[in-house]
């Protein structure tokens, strides 16, 4: 089992003291946590240096929470908003196509599925909320990788060789880069048997209020229901669904 770092625990204990007090002095922190004054001083200096605490001048000097904590809380709240809103929108998209609809986010070199609404057909895609797949093998993953800037994409590709889930998976980094350029230009991605030879999938990006691609929505179905009309029909549907979800997250096309 990994070792717990006492200094980190103490720093978190300090931050949690501010849950019921807007400002605290070093003496109050010391008394509440029963820690040595030198330890508290070092932790407070470190938290101030990183912006997690702000110094309030006076006698005595006091401290209050800094902006990074608000940003972390906002990021967490934003993820909750994404899931809540996505559940509603994916149900509407699934009702329109009667195929599996997913919303996923990028986590390192993988995608993680946050929301899924299944089709009513007896033959359907095998997936689940929380499932992880190599991003480059999926339509949602390609959308999310294409949204990264060059350094971020380089970092993902540097994690190791590109895994092959099927013979159709893209395993060459330069070929993937070229493919992502096309995805970026078109705003839509496809998985043509790259994660499962029996499945087809199309995806589009979901943007937040700042215009950042924070998730991707997809429509997936087995090849037995794939027709020449499917790509165009599903692409239009997933674009519309992703745009609807983006709007619910505060994105406005007229402002970008």
Predicted feature locations:
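All-alpha effector-binding/dimerization core of bacterial HTH-type transcriptional repressors
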Residues: 74-122, 147-150, 176-182
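N-terminal helix-turn-helix
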Residues: 1-84, 243-251
